[in-house]
Amino acid sequence: MAASETVRLRLQFDYPPPATPHCTAFWLLVDLNRCRVVTDLISLIRQRFGFSSGAFLGLYLEGGLLPPAESARLVRDNDCLRVKLEERGVAENSVVISNGDINLSLRKAKKRAFQLEEGEETEPDCKYSKKHWKSRENNNNNEKVLDLEPKAVTDQTVSKKNKRKNKATCGTVGDDNEEAKRKSPKKKEKCEYKKKAKNPKSPKVQAVKDWANQRCSSPKGSARNSLVKAKRKGSVSVCSKESPSSSSESESCDESISDGPSKVTLEARNSSEKLPTELSKEEPSTKNTTADKLAIKLGFSLTPSKGKTSGTTSSSSDSSAESDDQCLMSSSTPECAAGFLKTVGLFAGRGRPGPGLSSQTAGAAGWRRSGSNGGGQAPGASPSVSLPASLGRGWGREENLFSWKGAKGRGMRGRGRGRGHPVSCVVNRSTDNQRQQQLNDVVKNSSTIIQNPVETPKKDYSLLPLLAAAPQVGEKIAFKLLELTSSYSPDVSDYKEGRILSHNPETQQVDIEILSSLPALREPGKFDLVYHNENGAEVVEYAVTQESKITVFWKELIDPRLIIESPSNTSSTEPA
């Protein structure tokens, strides 16, 4: 057998080893016959001083690293070796190239080689296709340049100029014709419109004159003719009100309507004063039927004149009240309400009971008294959609079917109409309110600043020194643990800060108080155990640790590092 070659080595640790946490310098007697390479020496040191099997140790002799694959004969007697706990990912799967300068991983080298092979297979086709297309484009461009000669260029410019001139001449002729065609109907329409605007009263004046002539020639048929004329006039005015083409047309119609009824009422009053006997000779049945027809068509009845009997006035008043109810029921929508107001403005101020009747114009706003003896109020046609203040008519009826009508007074039947108390009501206030709000709204350029809470910068624990063994009690350490995540899958946690409460060197168990933030408490899941005590209280054993104190083996800690507090912090914490 070969003689044993024992060597005495002095080992210097950066941090106390797990087996002897109170010292960092040791003497070790090594038999070189048992240690063939430096790796054997490292495994011997790992075994003697309680390092875990996964801990990678590096041996340095006078500042130089002893390669793991070198012979252990490099170590001589009384040599001082520095033992350093290296990072794990430094020397895993490393390939040293001949120069020794570059360290490449096997996986990366394989991937690069595979990519190079694929590139060599696919590149020729791609390059050929790109070159092919580029050469094609270059050839086409060269051909185009060669084909363009100066003569051809001059010919093309001349032909283009001629074409442009021809197009311009044709375009001007066509445009002139089209403009003439367009202007001619427009001019005609404008002329007709101007004529109508200048003479809005001419057809009505003619109708009144014809009516007067017919009255003189045939006095008996004057009442019927007047009713027919009134029907025609009402239909024309309603049609013109329902379909206005523009604002100017509507204004002209308003003027004609405001002037027309007053003239018709004057003529009717004169005729009634001159021929009271002839009108009274007619049968009441015919008058009732004509009044009813007129009320159904127009929705409003003309008030009877002085010469008519009390029976005719009562029948016409009843029919007018019924027609008013029908018209008001149909005017639920804003458009119907607008049409209703316009028709009210048409017949405002026509026939009124009493000798002192005065005509009213439809453009008058609000309410006006018609006369001293009349005692009635007529609504003026207002441009807005809102209804007048009081639209009530007192006919002795006790029921108030429409709340927006005024409270009905009790007047003598056939004599005067009761004055309704003004009750303000607006049918369509939405558009007016919107406009008012838009005008009254004050635009404010106010910006609210939303600031996120200041994120605390994460500590870089990789700069802290690694721990080979458990430090002293009371020291703070940073470590990782293999634990279940919130989805109950095992994973390495982030760095946690903890304080060493106790350490057992024999069992290598460590009690650690976790100082970092714990996860928020939640309801127990499917992997959490719930126990019931005798008193009925529930005890939950979470699969994911929720406690601030843990007891683990030192080997279970991943990358334990010592947290070194700066002297400024320690001095500030100490009492002055």
UniProtKB/Swiss-Prot annotation:
Tudor domain location: 460-559
Compartment(s) where it occurs, according to its Swiss-Prot or TrEMBL record: Nucleus; Nucleus, Cajal body
Positions of the UniProt region annotated as 4 X 2 AA tandem repeats of R-G: 413-420
Sequence repeats: 223-226, 268-271, 386-389, 413-414, 415-416, 417-418, 419-420, 517-520
Cross-link type Glycyl lysine isopeptide (Lys-Gly) (interchain with G-Cter in SUMO2), residue numbers: K127, K151, K160, K204, K209, K274, K281, K293, K297, K444, K496
Modification sites for Phosphoserine: S105, S184, S248, S250, S256, S271, S272, S301, S403, S487, S489, S566
Species this protein is from: Homo sapiens (Human)
Name of the protein in its database record: Coilin
Comp. bias intervals (Polar residues): 214-225
Pfam families on file: Coilin_N, Tudor_Coilin
Gene of this entry: COIL
Lineage of the species this protein comes from: Eukaryota, Metazoa, Chordata, Craniata, Vertebrata
Biased composition range(s): Low complexity: 235-250, 301-320
Domain of life: Eukaryota
Gene Ontology biological process: spliceosomal snRNP assembly
Oligomeric and partner information: Interacts with ANKS1B. Interacts with SMN1 (via Tudor domain). Interacts (via C-terminus) with AK6. Interacts with WRAP53/TCAB1. Interacts with HMBOX1. Interacts with PSME3; the interaction is inhibited by PSME3IP1. Interacts wit UBL5.
Phosphothreonine modification, residue list: T122, T290, T303, T456
Any single GO CC term annotated in Swiss-Prot or TrEMBL for this entry: nucleoplasm
Region feature Required for interaction with SMN, mapped onto this chain: 392-420
Key words, A-Z: Isopeptide bond, Nucleus, Phosphoprotein, Repeat, Ubl conjugation
Region spans: 2 X 4 AA repeats of S-L-P-A: 386-520
